[in-house]
Amino acid sequence: MKLYRHLAWDGIRKNSRLYVPYLLTGVGAVSFFYILVALARLPEGTLPGSGSVQVILNLGSFVLWVFSLLLLFYTHSFLIRRRNREFALYNVLGMGKRDIARILCWETLLSGGISLAGGLALGILLGKLAELGLLRMVGAATDMVYRVSAGGLLLTLGLYAGIFLLILISSLVRVGRSTAVQLMRSQAEGEKPPRANWALALLGILLLAGAYYLAVTIREPLAALTWFFAAVLMVIAATYLLFISGSVTLCRLLQKNPRFYYQKRHFVSVSSLVYRMKRNGAGLASICILGTMVLVMLSSTTCLYFGAEDSLRTRYPRDENITAYFPDRASQSGDLTPLRTAVADAVRRSGMSAANVWEYRSVSSVMTLRDGVLSPNEGFGNPVDVTLIPLADYNAAMGTDLTLPQGQVYVCRSRTGYQGTSLTLQNGPTWQVAGLLDNFSPSGSDSASVVTQLWLIVPDLSAADDLEQVMNRANMGVSRSWYYGFDLDRQLPDAADPVAEAIRRMAQDGGLMENGVLGVESLAENRGDFYGSYGSLFFLGILLSVGFSLAAVLIIYYKQISEGYEDQARFDIMQKVGMTRRDIRSSINSQLLLVFFLPLLLAGLHLAFAFPFVHKLLLLFNLWNTRLLVGTTAVSFLAFAVLYTLVYRITSNAYYHIVSGGGER
């Protein structure tokens, strides 16, 4: 037993160039996962909006575990490929498959033990720092209590031990099915270029074009959410197809160009790429996809976090947002003075005063707009939230003195691109558009609508009768409401609003409305949930972006190291026939520049076309600040490009060190 343990440890030590990054990957994955599950298990009340924060963190931990499974399997394949010759020699020298299996068991036990112990220790060590960072991001109070989650430790230990067990089973199956000759040849065996390259390339182009078309043509946020994951799958498939088949096609075209191919700096690099292009293309595609994930995730979550106040103020434009819903026109058209007086009394009893009052009545319904005709939305076509506001309420709210004859409407351009000269109700009257207004935006719950909104200023509420008749014929109704919002003369602490509580108590006692329902939304009460959700998304975005970036770096490193060992013999031969070290460096730069920056360029292209998608998805969070999203996207790409270039310089030097004779054979 000691012999097998010694051989396993000796194998890890001799292949430290490959094993150290693998072990660091395991340690990092385990520590990141433990931190997420430990944060999701913080005591109740520690985080604002703890329900949504826990859901986000648990979802993130699941994504991280699945990603860890794929990444550890991927990196372990490089180790096994490098160790195959060693296992073949053991077999030739008299060791049976069972003996090799015992060595593999010890290697997995050692590497898994180091990863689990180191990862849990690092996770516990950094757990408090991560907790303080999360609490700061969500705007919660911090404490100095050091917590260790026993449940998080057990869950992390069980799930990641399962990953290493699966890796062991995969290695045993691979070695068990191979002969000594196959193991000996596998390390140096080239790969045949895939067949039907043009067909695969064309399929990849079509898939990518389809995904890009969806990204730039979808207008509705809900439709963007529906099609987003389909577009992501299309982009992933297209990226793999283009890198695998397109790289082969590119190499063949370069080989057919004698002036390019038969140069010292190009001959070795291009010829070696052809024999491993399937694996090389898959690695480049993985780097591209990881880079795109980092860019999209970091730019969107950063935009959400720094735009949280804008989003909060869009959803809750006043400190207190009161909406009364009426069952019919008579109650909506009645005297609203008692409601205003009761609200003012509640504010006064709380020791505060109201300011910046904003109020209006409205009648709304979900319809379909096509060629200037409004019809009931019965599940077909894109929905449009149509809202009618009487001119008197608009003039009072905006301080204007507009006039409007019967049969005409003003169109508010907020969130709608309607440019027609008239609007016709299905089987109803036609309204002429008297003009476009720019300075009126929805408030209260109306601001949370994620469908296209069409706000119409009508002469009076009688115009809504025609709308109600059209909707009633389709067995659909309208919503009649009155919005009353105001700011308070001093800022309230988060999650505490005595004014909102007083108004709710009055509504529950039946002293405010005889007919209808009254709803109260407080900015102070909801601020904690907003910052809790957005802050935790930003925290998760940073954590996963770091993880995905390290994964991309790891793939680049293993790609360079493994290809360096494969190319070592080729460059050794070329040196013997006259190639200098300067020629080797020039050839290496030619090879790396040929394929290395393609993932970065394509990731940038993916990000550019994903921008409209991301923008529409952020509208679901009431974030309309396009300029902020442009800024975070640009900064994210520049930062990732700098990191990518640094990794390129470091790994190209490691590759050169190996092929020029500095690495072990």
What are these regions (language model features)?
Residues 1-6, 177-191, 565-566, 656-665:
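Short cytosolic juxtamembrane segments of multi-pass membrane proteins
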Residues 1-30, 193-198, 207, 242-291, ...:
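N-terminal Sec/SRP start-transfer signal
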Residues 38-50, 120-152, 209-226, 599-662:
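Short helix-loop junctions at transmembrane helix boundaries
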Residues 110-254:
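Hydrophobic alpha-helical segments
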